[in-house]
Amino acid sequence: MYTDFSKLRNIGISAHIDSGKTTLTERILFYTKRIHAIHEVKGKDGVGATMDSMELERERGITIASAATHCEWKGLHLNIIDTPGHVDFTIEVERSLRVLDGAILVLCSVAGVQSQSLTVDRQMRRYNVPRLAFVNKCDRSGANPIRVKDQLREKLQHNPVLMQLPIGLEDKFEGVVDLVKMKAFRFSGDDGEVITESEIPADMQADAARAREELLDAASMFSDELTDAILEDRVTEELIKAAVRKGTLALKLTPVFMGSAYKNKAVQKLLDGVVDYLPDPTEVVNEAHDLTKDEEKVALTIDNEKPTVALAFKLEDGRYGQLTYLRIYQGKLSRDMFITNMRTKKDHRIGRLVRMHSDQMEDIDAAGSGDIVAMFGVDCNSGDTFTDGTVKLNMTSMHVPEPVIALSIKPVDSKSETNMGKALRRFTREDPTFRAGLDEESGETIIRGMGELHLEVYIERMKREYNCIVEVSPPQVAYRETVSQRADFAYTHKKQTGGSGQFGRVCGYIEPCEQQFEFVDDVVGGAIPREFISAVEKGFRSMLAKGRLLGFPVVNTRVVINDGASHAVDSSDIAFQEAARGAWREGFDRAKPRLLEPIMRVVCEGPAEFSGGILGTLMQRRAMIIGSQDDGGLARIEAEVPLAEMFGYSTTLRSATQGKAEFSMEFSRYLPVPAAMAEELMTKASKKAEGGKK
């Protein structure tokens, strides 16, 4: 268990596909003596990279599932967390990024800043993750790390500063000039483990002096002490490092390193950069919501003696049951300790606590604040917060957005049917924005989520991880129904069946409101006896699940009851529930009901020369443009678009921009469906219903 938190780093490694992320991780593990032989992603030895533990990953040479590992470098403990590959819709992304304190953004020296680099960087910016850039593949034909540094400024709006210059490029790449030490470093030996320090080559001294001056200019913006030292010509390595670190942690500076992971060059210098410039857990602000004070935010302290607060950020089906990855934000965890799940309020005993190394694990007795570990034997969901029971804090707000899109899926055979149940159970535990259930009328399995891509990812995972193949129906939009004006109702439910009958009368009105549903009891004089008021409310609430237009849930509706009647013998809970249902039907039909559709906030980003084409694709889809901007050749267009118009949009956008633009989409609000479209939807629904009756 760590007590010197300055010696701890929690970092992520993110990149566009094929930028060399897994190869870089493999080298980091080798140089930190975590592994004792290097295996390539698509190596001839057939072993495959350490971090690619799934068979499918090793066959294809890509990383599918995320992995976590840890290693030591120069007395520091590094936890390396793989950031998720799909960064669009799931809550899991937010959790994974919350777990990181800093990150390495890997860029290809030839291709530079690519579309996925933009996406990854945007996510990190959203969660305030300080980062270093590593320009990889300097040995490749066409390598130009200086151009990539410029792209960081132009395309990502970073303030990049070179920490190194390359010694040679392409097949002549030998090493780097360290602009802080003003020394040359070359890497030799079978695996680049022999580092030779020497003077800067004569033909590079002028370039190195110029680049160091730029480094000092950029760093001095964050340190008056460094500014004074520059003027007095007494600059030290420590002053430069302290200033660059300050700028990096403030997200105002991006130190740029370079090398070739595949050719084993300069990875050790990047590790030095992680130590020097990325934050330890005490330098990052983490907050929790106090459940005793209406989810008020409270700051957490990296302190092993404080009450324990930990977040389950990833679940895996391990060989010994569910494996839960945890980040400890405050306090400590130990084996056999009892912890409380803040969502379920249940206590659990930690049966086994481990450190992960890809798919291998090492048992430990305890872990402290700021650390990342995994536990077995605790039943939980991804995103659950655990405490030691002395505090009621939650790491994430309890609010989970409602799904906006649904698909019906059907397994192709009995084997797929068995596996589908297992897959859906696991996915709904991992991701609260993903829902699955049975449609009572059709008997079909319906999955719901935050967008097309969100559901596509899970259908693909079913196939890959559970060998479950399903047929997918066209997507369905999660419409809602509401009323648009006030309407009165006065309904009497009367039933005589011999013996005691049923009687209940309910009067009042229905009207639009801001809340999902509001029930107001304005009955005076005992017209409806008090003991039946809750039955009346229950009757009204039972009608909310299915509206009377197309059977979608009803929202933004207030029901006020102000009169009624009862019978001494025939009135009962059941009678008043039925009276309320009849009153609802009467009032709802008179209150001009209408359909609401989900409106998505869509952000499109691509080269400025395609901005006209991007606008065109949006305007064809009933979009309302909110704003557009052009940042250094990168156009960003923000719009609100009905979800019903967004199906297949990725293909349209790709063809309109030669595949150079991308978009993200999130739910914004519900708005009324235009009258003509609502009419069309209802006509389709009635035809479908008639077809079903035949």
Curated annotation (Swiss-Prot):
Broad class of where this protein is predominantly found: cytoplasm
Cell compartments where the protein resides: Cytoplasm
Entry keyword set: Cytoplasm, Elongation factor, GTP-binding, Nucleotide-binding, Protein biosynthesis
Positions with a binding annotation for GTP: 15-22, 82-86, 136-139
NCBIfam families hit by this protein: EF-G, PRK12740.1-5, small_GTP
PROSITE patterns in the record: G_TR_1, G_TR_2
Taxonomy, superkingdom: Bacteria
Physiological role: Catalyzes the GTP-dependent ribosomal translocation step during translation elongation. During this step, the ribosome changes from the pre-translocational (PRE) to the post-translocational (POST) state as the newly formed A-site-bound peptidyl-tRNA and P-site-bound deacylated tRNA move to the P and E sites, respectively. Catalyzes the coordinated movement of the two tRNA molecules, the mRNA and conformational changes in the ribosome.
Family of the protein in this entry: Belongs to the TRAFAC class translation factor GTPase superfamily. Classic translation factor GTPase family. EF-G/EF-2 subfamily.
A cellular component annotation (GO) from this entry: cytoplasm
Xref: CDD domains: EF-G, EFG_III, EFG_mtEFG1_IV, mtEFG1_II_like
Domain called tr-type G: residue spans: 6-282
Protein name in the entry: Elongation factor G 2
